From Swiss-Prot:
Free-text function comment from the UniProt entry: Involved in the detoxification of xenobiotics. Shows maximal activity with C6 substrates, with gradually decreasing activity from C8 to C12 substrates. No activity for higher chain length substrates acids rather than long-chain ones.
Organism: Bacillus subtilis (strain 168)
Gene3D superfamilies: alpha/beta hydrolase
Catalytic residues as annotated in Swiss-Prot or TrEMBL: 93, 192, 222
Family annotation (InterPro entries): AB_hydrolase_fold, Esterase_lipase, Hydrolase_4, MAG_DAG_Lipase
EC number(s) given by UniProt: 3.1.1.1
Protein name: Carboxylesterase
GO molecular function: carboxylesterase activity; lipase activity
Length: 246
């Protein structure tokens, strides 16, 4: 069975550019609808895909936050090289953490962290997430249940150094959130079981900018960009971007 894997995308629009960042074990499909929505309203949108994502899970464990941050910065530099001077960043989960890191690393017009963790529930929760991703990917490849079980046994023997590195990244970003002066719109799903939702309050309270807002989405889970309130999220993100001083 030919597996069609998501790829980076660029939707060319006007002079205002938005870098869209997906989550850990996710891919650009997580932010594609948001990208289309913003592009239809005049924005240029670019979404990099992190190394080791959208490929067999065996490849994921050989990459880490440093690789993914490089992919994010390459995405930012790509927009710059295409002539976009004004760039906002909008990210889901780990992508939201990266959007905050961009906020104190390079000039950013506005930041939208969506369901972004400021501390991880536990390494075990993350590990279960990786196993679930691996199992689903193998199903997606059309493998038999027996083959999947066999491959999963092997996969579970692989050291997951990535998870510790991810925790370190999140801790580092949390320590620097008070260096963010760009307007920030914190998006958080009420029924988010992947992260500690207190993270949203931490981000909102600690960013240094006065131009900030926090909105809770009462009907949504962690992948808020694909959940039942996604249309509202699209609209709210667009309205936030429209108010920025481009």
């Amino acid at each position: 069975m030919k597996v069609v894997t998501p790829k980076p995308f660029t939707f060319k629009g006007g002079d205002k550019a938005v870098l869209l960042l997906h989550g850990f074990t996710g891919n650009t499909a997580d932010v594609r609808m948001l990208g289309r929505y913003l592009n239809e309203r005049g924005y240029t949108c670019h979404a990099p895909q992190y190394e080791g994502h959208g490929v067999p899970p065996e490849e994921l464990v050989h990459t880490g936050p440093e690789d993914w941050w490089k992919n994010v910065m390459d995405g930012y530099e790509y927009l710059k090289s295409e002539g976009y001077e004004s760039i906002a960043a909008c990210g889901l989960s780990l992508g939201g953490v990266f959007s905050l890191k961009l906020g104190y690393t390079v000039p950013i017009k506005g930041i939208v962290p969506m369901c972004a963790p400021m501390h991880i529930k536990s390494e075990e929760v993350m590990y279960q997430g990786v196993l679930s991703y691996a199992r689903n990917y193998k199903k997606f490849e059309g493998k038999s249940p027996e083959q999947i079980e066999e491959e999963m046994k092997e996969f579970e023997k692989t050291p997951m150094n990535t998870l510790k590195a991810l925790q370190d990244l999140i801790a580092d970003v949390r320590n620097n959130v008070d260096m963010i002066y760009s307007p920030t719109f914190v998006v958080q799903a009420r029924h988010d079981h992947m992260i500690n939702t207190e993270s949203a309050n931490i981000i909102y309270n600690e960013v240094e900018t006065d131009d900030k807002q926090l909105k809770w989405y009462e009907e949504s889970g962690h992948v808020i960009t694909l959940d039942k309130e996604r249309d509202l999220v699209h609209q709210d993100v667009y309205e936030f971007l429209e108010k920025l001083d481009w």
